[in-house]
Amino acid sequence: MDRKLLLIILDGVPHANFRRYFGCLEGWVASGAARVWRMRSVIPSMSGPCYASIHTGVEPQVHGVLSNAHICRVGLPDVFAQVRAAGGVTGAVTHSWWSEFFNRAPFEPVRDIEYDEPDSATINHGRFHTMSGYDHVNQMTPSDADLFATLTMLCRRFGLNYGILHTCTLDSLGHRFGHDCAQMDHGCALLDAMLALYLPGWREMGYEVIVTADHGQSLRGHHGGTEDTQRDVALYWFGGGEGPAPATLLDQRALAPTILSRLGAPIPATMRHAPFLA
């Protein structure tokens, strides 16, 4: 495989926050260096179900992760497995649930917090965090600076064809403070600046890049339901290909086949939604 793509998941960022607070991302759109669409998540718009849908291309009622209490190995074809089947190298810098969904479960911290498994059929290079002890007061989230540096290190050291970064910082901020507040303004600005620091380097390394979220949140910081604020996110695309009209509403289930299409990996029959990039 000679193509490369990175998926950056900023957990819990609603569409409105992307478009009003991420000035660096929006500046790239204005300059023509990126494109942006609105994307709607599956329901329930909870983290676990959305993670599984992002990588399998099917709704929770099919893949079986119906809530954040259903953490198990998903038994359907997924992005990691398809990239590996096509000869690509995969990496993940994410919450530990991604490892449980797509490599092995249950997550054993000493064994699974960090691994390099060149022969794995799914994730070759994993760097994970559990957020154990998380509550309303203590977010237990790792520094985004460390996550971004770690993904870049994996790209340089192992030549990833597909890599994913997932950060829960803004999701946790939203649960604690809501969205109409100075804390959220500042948090979005910091992550936007982090993207500005790393994204040009990824592009220079030959990566196409997707920046998006798994789900949104209500103004009070809730998600899981059906409201547009809880489901709708922005998707920014840094790469080639023909995309849909700017006003098109993307389906989250089309993300997995789109990633595979860009990488030249086979799209399994279980992924029934057409790629939105040609």
Feature names for model-found ranges:
Residues M1-A278:
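Feature captures the catalytic ectodomains and active-site-proximal regions of enzymes
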